[in-house]
Design a protein with these regions (language model features):
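Alpha/beta-hydrolase active-site loop
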Residues: 128-147
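Conserved alpha/beta-hydrolase "acid-adjacent" motif
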Residues: 252-258
Length: 302
């Protein structure tokens, strides 16, 4: 989708809109809009470790020029350490209950950045279903670095799981560990009923209307041109960055040949966890699994 694929990851400019920037200087969460390399505004939330974000209790402040243009730290005394950048699945957003649940668990292990992909939630633009979303993730990772974090772990679910793989492959050295949950290995898969419905949603005008008004997801009408690097093609390029692939054996979207293809492509630098009884993506990820992922991330990148 779009006239050119996100074939590389440019360093995104961090330009919060000052009138909507939520930042407090006492270690509380903050919320802002980031600008991607192609100019899309991405709604993003930062939570210091151990702090739970509550969208009903935010404080909006203006900040100095350094924070607006990405040339200075928006907070004084931000902890130098591990941060999780969470990439949600298709039709999710930063305020969805399951995304917030994931963030709460990972906040026990480090700081957390959540954001809404383009076309989702409060973010601008239209969804390209995993293509240019790599630029959205790049902006969020750059923001985490700007805030002073020295170790970044990206955790993606479903569409977000494919995005974290491509981002790590295209931006060598940009992250310290990668976790991909419920991701496809290859594009254009239609082997399950949910994926056939998703393709109708994305490719048909009536489907995109359902996406906009029923699922709060604005989907781009253009097809991919060129087709982006597939997840299974991206995985070998991630090494030596540690990679964890997680998949449920009850996933109704992508059967187990997908994670096994990813694990085979990863070789010795990747790990595969097949979770008994788990369905698809963040909605199905139980808290004990999320804690195990947190432990894994700390051991590899912390």
């Amino acid at each position: 989708m779009g006239t050119d694929g996100a074939g590389h990851v440019a360093r995104s400019t961090i330009r919060p809109y000052s009138e909507t920037l939520n930042v407090t200087r006492d270690g509380a969460p903050m919320r802002t809009f980031l600008h991607t390399a192609d100019g899309v505004a991405i709604d993003s939330v930062y939570e210091p470790g151990g702090v739970v974000y509550d969208s009903g209790k935010v404080v909006y402040e203006r900040v100095g020029e350094g924070a607006r243009n990405g040339s200075g730290n928006a907070l004084s005394g931000v902890s130098q350490g591990l941060v999780f950048v969470i990439a949600h699945g298709f039709t999710g957003d930063a305020d969805r209950p399951h995304v917030r649940r994931v963030a709460r668990v990972f906040a026990r292990y480090g700081a957390v950045v959540t954001f809404s992909f383009r076309g989702h939630g409060r973010s601008g633009g239209r969804s390209t279903v995993g293509d240019r979303e790599v630029l959205d993730l790049a902006a969020a990772v750059a923001w985490a670095r700007e805030l002073g974090h020295t170790r970044v772990v990206t955790v993606g679910f479903s569409m977000g799981g494919s995005v974290v793989l491509r981002h790590a492959a295209l931006d060598a050295g940009g992250v310290d560990a990668v976790v991909s949950v419920s991701a496809p290995a290859r594009w254009f898969y239609r082997g399950t009923a949910p994926m056939r419905r998703l393709h109708w949603l994305v490719t048909r005008p009536s489907g995109r209307l359902v996406g906009r008004y029923g699922l709060r997801t604005r989907i781009h009408h253009r097809q991919w041109d060129p087709v982006p690097l597939s997840p299974v093609e991206a995985v070998p390029r991630i090494a030596p960055t540690p990679l964890l692939v997680v998949h449920g054996d009850q996933d109704t979207y992508f059967p187990l040949d997908h994670p096994r293809m990813l694990a085979d492509a990863a070789g010795e630098h990747g790990e595969l966890w097949v979770e008994h009884g788990m369905g698809h993506a963040e909605n199905a990820a139980p808290e004990p699994l999320l804690r195990r992922i947190g432990d894994w991330a700390v051991a590899r990148a912390g």
